[in-house]
């Protein structure tokens, strides 16, 4: 399973990359705004900075919602760096755009997936990735992890090549559950990845080892 970090914060991206387990990065307009990155020129320059840090795919989202606009914007984004993946919303015009990009060798991430039917459409159009939003489904008392199971089953049935990129992942347990469900990729904040390191028995065991070592060396 691949780990992507879901942020536009360069310091956090660097920290994630330094762990040695980072495979990519996802961003969206909200994350860019959170970092105070405004204006197309500044946003696109920021994408380039992210690509300099991350040795892997970087999702950059189109703002346009019409077919022509998405094509124009997506083509320009793809030219920024070889690792750019054009992120396209799950709407009718978006699926058409994904098909075009797929036919022309441009990687895509179909975002805002909330149902198995949407996942089928994304795969049929040739999306490189699709992003089911786990946490947002949980927020409305639906089952985000179950959606991953459903998509995995469908994709395995028909040998679809689209990678399941679990998004809206809120914590370390979500990551593990996504892995169990067969997600190809999990994208999440840095603190969720870091949360995987910790277990009270690991801390207790290490403390005991160090205490025993110190005691033995005092003799």
Regions found by a protein language model. Name each.
Residues 28, 86, 122, 151, ...:
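Conserved, mostly hydrophobic/aromatic
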Residues 3-5, 9-13, 19-21, 27-100, ...:
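Active-site beta->alpha loop and helix N-cap motifs at the rims of alpha/beta catalytic domains
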Residues 11-19, 69-73, 97, 115-125, ...:
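Catalytic cores of alpha/beta
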Residues 111-165:
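A contiguous pocket-lining binding segment that forms or flanks enzyme active sites
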Residues 155-219:
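C-terminal alpha-helical cap/extension of soluble enzyme domains
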